[in-house]
A protein has these predicted regions:
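Conserved N-terminal segment of class I S-adenosyl-L-methionine
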Residues: 1-111, 115, 132, 227-232, ...
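S-adenosyl-L-methionine-dependent methyltransferase catalytic module, highlighting the catalytic core
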Residues: 126-134, 144-264
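Generic signal for short, ordered secondary-structure residues
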Residues: 14-18, 41-42, 123, 190-194, ...
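A short beta-strand submotif of the Rossmann-like class I SAM-dependent methyltransferase core
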Residues: 118-121
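Active-site micro-motifs of SAM-dependent methyltransferase domains
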Residues: 101, 123, 154
Length: 270
């Protein structure tokens, strides 16, 4: 079976890659099995929720089914088209835009949001502080922002797990100097487009300490944070139990052994 959501018609599933169908399943699973409880709002009926980098918008489908008023912003043509195909019967407002460029979304957003979610996306954005400042402006007073990302020096911060060949999936491989990294990737037959993606990701990675400084400068309040050695999504992907990083209190080790850093931030009245 190519996907877990039996409500997806075959003619829709046939237009979408197996990987993206699995991402759609994971997005719904993540909302149901982790994020809903982590954010802590027992009733989201009527709440306005925006996901930045919604991809297939499976997470927004979960919240839409819970009664929330959901919107999804996506930059990628492929992922946006996937979202439109998969959510044809959902009342989710989907639009293409760049969170770093308000001109691309200001005519599509008419109100502020109670909850904004940016899950494993911020590490791909070159202008991270600008993106988070723009999200702050889109958040209602008292609203919450959930953000997750793999820190700069963790085992798979370079996203090399997406390389097709097993020899490209080695932990910490991205820490090689670029010239050696590219040579190795070419040697194992990695496509040029994938190599460029990996180099782009390597360039935009961010440390936990730098992210904390950005959060403070913008004016977010930290309601909750957690540092995971086996992050929640790994339960879906690999059947592993989620485990907090036992070294989270030790500088450097808190970065190296963290495979997922999570923040729940709020915008308070000033």
């Amino acid at each position: 079976m190519r996907h877990l959501d039996s409500s997806i018609p075959d003619y829709v599933a046939d237009q979408i890659s197996d990987r993206c169908l699995r991402c759609y399943d994971e997005q719904q699973w993540y909302g149901k099995n982790f994020l809903f409880d982590y954010i802590g709002d027992l009733d989201v009926t009527g709440k306005k929720i925006l996901e930045i980098g919604c991809a297939e918008a499976g997470l927004m489908k979960f919240y839409n089914d819970k009664g929330a008023i959901c919107s999804g912003l996506e930059l990628s043509d492929i992922r946006f088209n996937n979202a439109m195909l998969l959510n044809q019967d959902q009342s989710i407002y989907l639009f293409q835009a760049d969170i770093c460029k308000p001109i691309t979304y200001e005519n599509k957003i008419k109100d502020t949001y109670d909850i904004i979610i940016i899950r494993d996306v911020i590490e791909h954005i070159p202008e991270q502080e600008l993106a988070l400042k723009n999200m702050y402006d889109l958040l209602s007073v008292g609203g919450k922002l959930f953000m997750s990302f793999p820190p700069k020096f963790c085992a798979y911060a370079g996203h090399q797990q997406t390389v097709p060949k097993i020899l490209g999936k080695l932990p910490y491989l991205y820490l090689l100097p670029n010239s050696i990294y590219v040579f190795y990737l070419k040697l194992i037959g990695c496509p040029e487009k994938k190599i460029q993606y990996l180099l782009d990701t390597k360039r935009t990675r961010i440390t936990i300490s730098k992210m904390k400084k950005i959060i403070n400068r913008i004016g977010y309040d930290v309601q909750k944070k957690s540092n995971w050695i086996i992050r929640p999504a790994y339960s879906f992907r690999f059947g592993l139990p989620r485990i907090l990083n036992p070294f989270s209190w030790i500088p450097i080790l808190n970065e190296i052994f963290c495979n997922g850093m999570l923040f729940l931030l709020t915008k308070e009245q000033r």
